[in-house]
């Protein structure tokens, strides 16, 4: 058995996100599964899974994943909340998106707050 260093995990996460960008969702899912196994404490992997689902036009699945698994593991994570709000907005559920976006805006993650503010004000 082996472990991944933090740098190796970052590299794999970047490769997974590159695969998402090239619509290679199965490859990305495999890489993210490996990362999730070896770095289960990293919310960035959960965020990347949500991004992959949304990039595959599976916004409902992204919301279900965020609600059912990701937020259970990382309660109140601002970036997960921001992406939940984005997915709900893309699904035409703006009223439902408001609560997670406002929570992301109040969080300590500046990037999540910027995303949330853009969606709330856009």
Model-derived segments and spans:
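Alpha-helical segment of the N-proximal tetratricopeptide repeat
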Residues: 8-30
């Amino acid at each position: 058995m082996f472990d991944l260093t933090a740098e190796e995990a970052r590299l794999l996460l970047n490769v997974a996100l590159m695969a998402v960008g090239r619509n290679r969702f199965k490859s990305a899912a495999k890489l993210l599964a490996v990362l999730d196994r070896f770095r289960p404490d990293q919310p960035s992997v959960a965020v990347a899974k949500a991004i992959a689902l949304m990039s595959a036009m599976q916004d409902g699945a992204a919301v279900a994943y965020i609600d059912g698994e990701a937020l259970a593991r990382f309660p109140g994570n601002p970036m997960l909340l921001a992406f939940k709000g984005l997915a709900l907005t893309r699904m035409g559920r703006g009223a439902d998106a408001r609560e997670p976006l406002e929570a992301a805006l109040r969080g300590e993650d500046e990037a999540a707050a910027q995303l949330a503010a853009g969606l709330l004000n856009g």
